[in-house]
Amino acid sequence: MEKAHADEFPLTTDSSEKQGVVCIFGTGDFGKSLGLKMLQCGYSIVFGSRNPQVSSLLPRGAEVLSYSEAASKSDIIILAMHREHYDSLTELVDYLKGKVLVDVSNNRKINQYPESNAEYLAQLEPGAHVVKAFNTISAWALQSGTLDASRQVFVCGNDSKAKQRVMDIARTLGLTPLDQGSLMAASEIENYPLQLFPMWRFPFYLSSVLCVFFFVYCAIREVIYPYVNGKTDATYRLAISIPNRVFPITALILLALVYLPGILAAILQLYRGTKYRRFPNWLDHWMLCRKQLGLVALGFAFLHVIYTLVIPIRYYVRWRLRNATITQALTNKDSPFITSYAWINDSYLALGILGFFLFLLLGITSLPSVSNMVNWREFRFVQSKLGYLTLVLCTAHTLVYGGKRFLSPSILRWSLPSAYILALVIPCAVLVLKCILIMPCIDKTLTRIRQGWERNSKYTQSALNGKSDI
């Protein structure tokens, strides 16, 4: 038996083939854009309008009729109109009976109404088969053809045959339909386009708080303190020096916070003796935001690298170097080469370079195009094993940078330690807790729990009852 080549099978239906008649209620931007796209894919389009005589700028080849006349032309009607105009459809109950009504509308706010637009439409037209679809596609994307970033179409409805017909239309348009179940999912589908970075809010807020706190903290130590004690103007540090302390500190803390929720979850499972209990909402949301926390941390690490690269061209640095050279020439004295200082300097630079390289690797593997090409074990190895190695290298980079100054009273300003000492608290705590959890006696118990073993049967009973200790 001969094997057929993949290129012998078309990915989408041939656009030259006649696909049937589809009716679109509404001649706005979305209705016209969707109609044009469907015409290009071989469909015959009939627009329904309140004023068919004055409708203009419609795709060539489309027919414009009144709502009742257009409804009689097709079994599938796409409602490209807002919810506020659904009441006008009550006059067309007889015309819409048995038809497939595709609701593409969105609201202005999340959960604006008690029920979804699709469910509201189903109440108005009980004899029709309402399907929610195409609300995640913009009119601009349909017109320009840039559908790569929004190719997925969520579809839901109570009638499986009606859903299948709508999904066939989506495939013909080159889209990827995803069946979301019954019409009860319409509310979630309608809320999806209205979300504004839901998983990024916590990382942004947290990073903003950390940046502001450490910026003010460093400004007190490095700008306000010298001015109060010696009338020295060090405000120039606000542009480069202080941000170049704040950015790596924020990056290190955020990186540690990526792995802290996993440790807390392990401790919680050990305490409960079972995995069949939901985590607290705050911990659950924190774990869902780990990827975003890591990417924000990578962004701050990038800023640290860029700010470090511009250090040699700063006026302050060039002035110090020039002044030191002139002073040595006038006094005829040179500074001795100290091998230990060279080791410390090169070590913290090497640790920083290696840490940033692995940080980049973590960021690259978190991209969907890359993560989809590796299996779960490979992804877990990179994000977990190499992730902790990255945290170790970045923490060691900061420790070596501090050197002996940790124990020196001279770094205190108004009894305030250097900012990098505060930055090491969370990363060191995470690494210490991780070392405890990987001890054989603890790791063996944790592995058994995650494989389904339970220490006490009462946890199973309370889990079934939906109770929580925390």
From Swiss-Prot:
One of its GO terms (cellular component) is Golgi membrane. It catalyses: 2 Fe(2+) + NADP(+) + H(+) = 2 Fe(3+) + NADPH; 2 Cu(+) + NADP(+) + H(+) = 2 Cu(2+) + NADPH. It holds the Pfam family Ferric_reduct. The chain crosses the membrane at residues 202-224, 236-256, 293-313, 342-362, 381-401, 419-439. Induction: By Tnfa (TNF-alpha), by Il6 in white and brown adipose tissue, and IL1B in white adipose tissue. Tnfa, Il6 and Il1b shows sinergistic stimulatory effects. InterPro entries: Fe3_Rdtase_TM_dom, NAD(P)-bd_dom_sf, P5C_Rdtase_cat_N, STEAP_metalloreductase. Disruption phenotype: Mice are viable and fertile, but exhibit overt inflammation with increased expression of Il6, Tnfa, Ccl2, haptoglobin and Socs3 in visceral adipose tissue as well as macrophage infiltration. They develop metabolic disease on regular diet with insulin resistance, glucose intolerance, mild hyperglycemia, dyslipidemia, and fatty liver disease. Adipocytes isolated from visceral fat exhibit severily defective glucose transport, with decreased expression of Slc2a4, Adipoq, Fas and Pparg. The keyword Chloroplast does not apply. One of its GO terms (molecular function) is ferric-chelate reductase (NADPH) activity. Gene3D superfamilies: NAD(P)-binding Rossmann-like Domain (3.40.50.720). This is Metalloreductase STEAP4. It comes from Mus musculus (Mouse).
